[in-house]
Amino acid sequence: MSAAPAPAPAAAAPRALPSRLSQFYALTKPRVVQLIVFCAFIGMVLAVPGMPSGAQWALMAVASAGIWLVAGAAAAFNCIVEQGIDAKMKRTAWRPTAKGELSNTQTLLFSALLCAAGSALLYWWVNPLTMWLTFATFVGYAVIYTVILKPLTPQNIVIGGASGAMPPVLGWAAMTGEVGPEALILFLIIFLWTPPHFWALALYRVEDYRKSGLPMLPVTHGNEFTRLQVFLYTLILFAGCLMPFVYGMSSWIYLAAAVVLSAGFCLYGFRLWRDYSDTLARKTFRFSLIHLSLLFAALLVDHYLL
């Protein structure tokens, strides 16, 4: 009796395309980009008095898609530059470029395609100002921060945080064709939020960063100094989060949420400074994400209720 024939190699083919697509999708750092688009969307909504019209909702959708594409392009370019660093760090070793699953040429072409598509979408269907601001953000993150600042100085997060704080400005520009003071207040909040957010991560990932050779603050200045900086920045951030109410762009609903959320972040910062543990640093990092998401959600609720 003859043996059963071996399965044909072609049987694995249907899984190849989905696997390759998932690798390209991973390059865009989806969770990070989702937060970017969310913050940009909040900027869009706040820029429109009252309930948006159908045409304005359509404009928001197109602008969000364009910003998503360019943000994904910046993330993919970052994966090329930091391929060697990512391979040394447990947190990033899974990335397709770090594992050698995608070549630099493939990743660069993918990044260029996303950037070109997003820029064209923003230029022709939104407005040129939004396109140029979004492209400047791409350059700020992918080149100035990733290539120059990140390997050069422990203040990389502080200076480079400007590019990460741009999403609400992009959203505001998409709907109004200008950058108003309200957009700059939203920019300030994210700019002040960025250092304690990333330094909390760097504290419990310090060995990863030490192996990578990046001059993150816990590596260059030590654990205790970084913990103090996290706490001090949460205090400064508290003041910054009050600015929408002080300027008159929100009411007591946002104010109450800002006080509670910012006080919680300050408490985490204080506890981290006084009694450090990796577990607490991880909780502080996670709370920072909750803080920003709920803070901007409170702005949205406040905008429509009062």
UniProtKB/Swiss-Prot annotation:
State the coiled-coil residue ranges.
none
Checking NCBIfam families in the record gives: cyoE_ctaB (TIGR01473), PRK04375.1-2 (NF003349)
Q: Which InterPro entries match?
A: Protohaem_IX_farnesylTrfase (IPR006369), UbiA_prenyltransferase (IPR000537), UbiA_prenylTrfase_CS (IPR030470), UbiA_sf (IPR044878)
Enzyme group, top EC level?
transferase
**What PANTHER family would the database entry show?**
4-HYDROXYBENZOATE SOLANESYLTRANSFERASE, PROTOHEME IX FARNESYLTRANSFERASE, MITOCHONDRIAL
Q: Which family does it belong to?
A: Belongs to the UbiA prenyltransferase family. Protoheme IX farnesyltransferase subfamily.
| Pathway(s) per entry | Porphyrin-containing compound metabolism; heme O biosynthesis; heme O from protoheme: step 1/1
Q: Which keywords, in A-to-Z order, does the entry hold? A: Cell inner membrane, Cell membrane, Heme biosynthesis, Membrane, Transferase, Transmembrane, Transmembrane helix
Localization per record: Cell inner membrane
- State the gene name recorded for this protein: ctaB
Its chief place of residence is: membrane
One annotated GO molecular function is:
protoheme IX farnesyltransferase activity
The record gives the membrane topology as: Multi-pass membrane protein
What EC number(s) is this enzyme filed under? 2.5.1.141
Q: What does this protein do?
A: Converts heme B (protoheme IX) to heme O by substitution of the vinyl group on carbon 2 of heme B porphyrin ring with a hydroxyethyl farnesyl side group.
Name of the molecule in the record: Protoheme IX farnesyltransferase
Q: Which organism is it from?
A: Acidovorax ebreus (strain TPSY)
A biological-process GO annotation: heme O biosynthetic process
**Catalytic activity reported:** heme b + (2E,6E)-farnesyl diphosphate + H2O = Fe(II)-heme o + diphosphate
**This protein's GO CC annotations:** plasma membrane
> Which ranges does the record mark as transmembrane?
32-52, 57-77, 108-128, 129-149, 157-177, 183-203, 230-250, 252-272, 285-305
Miscellaneous note, as given in the UniProt record, is: Carbon 2 of the heme B porphyrin ring is defined according to the Fischer nomenclature.
